[in-house]
Amino acid sequence: MAETKEFKTLYNLFIDSYLQKLAQHSIPTNVTCAIHIGEVIGQFKNCALRITNKCMSNSRLSFTLMVESFIEVISLLPEKDRRAIAEEIGIDLDDVPSVVSKLEKNCNAYAEVNNIIDIQKLNIGECSAPPGQHMLLQIVNTGSAEANCGLQTIVKSLNKIYVPPIIENRLPYYDPWFLVGVAIILVIFTVAICSIRRNLALKYRYGTFLYV
């Protein structure tokens, strides 16, 4: 897989932004994880999975930073598309990131109903790359069942949208004219990864992979 070209989606940009925010925040993220991701399931094709622990003592903050990263990344899309994705996920773009979103309310209810104590299972949907390419899917465990639930929802939506090489990993450096060009390119190149489906189920189980 190392010899193939990496296939980027909006989720890659989102997770880069999210990790940056977690790293820059003053609250330490090296606390003992209250929640571990015990299993990741989905349909995988040419997809590498990485689990990263960035556990925080403030679960509300981790969710807020996640919403901030999501809003930043989908700002690259035309307004109609970004509002459709935000509505699908359960985030109101007219609210500030610190407002409790529909997504967060749903995830709070999910964690309570499923009585998640220390091990959590995630279903990330599809992770597929074309022949000769691979996708790196990075899952960030913040130690919060609610935030992990939010991440699960976001990955299912953003991992369907292809990102041309011209914009990959450059989210913090856009100027206004570059953003206009990016929006046009995304409209042209956006593809649904589900069109290259392959029904191949793969499971990650806690304790069998090395955390990084």
UniProtKB/Swiss-Prot annotation:
Gene Ontology cellular component list: membrane; viral envelope; virion membrane
UniProt modification remark: Disulfid bonds are oxidized in the cytoplasm by OPG088 protein. Unglycosylated because produced in viral factories instead of the classic ER -Golgi route.
Highest taxon listed in the record's lineage: Viruses
Residue ranges annotated as Intravirion topological domain: 197-212
Record-linked InterPro entries: Virion_mem_poxvirus_L1 (IPR003472)
Annotated disulfide bonds: 33-55, 47-127, 107-149
Chief location bin: virion
Topology of the protein relative to the lipid bilayer: Single-pass membrane protein
TM stretches of this protein: 176-196
Virion surface topological domain residue ranges: 1-175
A Pfam family this chain is assigned to: L1R_F9L
Location(s), subcellular: Virion membrane
Record keywords, A-Z: Disulfide bond, Late protein, Membrane, Transmembrane, Transmembrane helix, Viral envelope protein, Virion
Quaternary assembly: Component of the entry fusion complex (EFC) composed of OPG053, OPG076, OPG086, OPG094, OPG095, OPG099, OPG107, OPG143, OPG104, OPG147 and OPG155. Except for OPG095 and OPG052, each of the EFC proteins is required for assembly or stability of the complex.
Family: Belongs to the orthopoxvirus OPG053 family.
Function: Component of the entry fusion complex (EFC), which consists of 11 proteins. During cell infection, this complex mediates entry of the virion core into the host cytoplasm by a two-step mechanism consisting of lipid mixing of the viral and cellular membranes and subsequent pore formation.
Protein name: EFC-associated protein OPG053
Organism of origin: Monkeypox virus
Name of the encoding gene: OPG053
